[in-house]
Amino acid sequence: ILVRHGQSIWNKERRFTGWADVDLTEQGKLEAKKAGTLIKSQKIEFDAYFTSCLKRANNSLEIILKILNKNDANIIKSKSLNERHYGGLTSLNKDETIKKFGIQQVKIWRRSFDVAPPAMEDTHPYKNKINSSIASESLKDTFKRVVPYFDKNIKPLIKLKKNILIVFHGNSCRALLMKIFNISKEKIIDFEIPTGNPLLIKFEDNLKVKSYKYLDPTRSKKIIFNA
């Protein structure tokens, strides 16, 4: 099961978040609780729990685990599952950024596969808080860290028929779904991940997708096979 974290404060304020470590809103906490309830209804016994190193994902997972009565679960955290680094756009309001650069340019920065936003300069107010040698990431850059991590650490567990829960971010999830569903870089531009809506994916023995569904069908997004 894959879950994008519940709504964060900057999601609500329509600000580019990336590697900035912001909290969940009250709505985001409710979304995580609902996700936990939906997951519990599936009666799945999980063997491993993965998340990023950012607290909006960590806290979403903790809320879900409370619903599942798994407060002592062994959680595996990795920066490889972090949100895409939004570079110089970090903390900027999306609507104001559109006014400044135009909707097409912002869409390319947000949704294209291989175009990174402007680099985060040393003078950026979040440079020291994020403290990363990475200045900006395209979805391709995110793909290059998420997919190898999945292949090395998670795919072997799936081969052993283990049940896995991953709580992470919109773009790291988009990158992984590109791999799992063979979504093209042209199609991924219009592909969005809803917050707090668990995506249940079942695999064949050869790791081909057997079936998939969002557990809350009222907030589902279509996934495109072989696009």
Regions found by a protein language model. Give the residues of each.
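Short, hydrophobic/glycine-enriched beta-strand segments
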Residues: 1-5, 166
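Amphipathic, non-transmembrane alpha-helical scaffold segments
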Residues: 25, 29, 50, 54, ...
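Phosphate-coordination/substrate-recognition cap region in phosphate-metabolizing enzymes
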Residues: 35-123, 178-202, 226-227
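Surface-exposed cleft-lining segments at the edges of enzyme active sites
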Residues: 127-143
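Short catalytic helix/loop segments, enriched in acidic residues and glycine
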Residues: 18-35
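Glycine-rich N-terminal loop/short-helix segment of MobA-like nucleotidyltransferase
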Residues: 7-22, 42
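Active-site-adjacent alpha-helix immediately C-terminal to a catalytic or transition-state-stabilizing loop
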Residues: 58, 66, 72, 140, ...
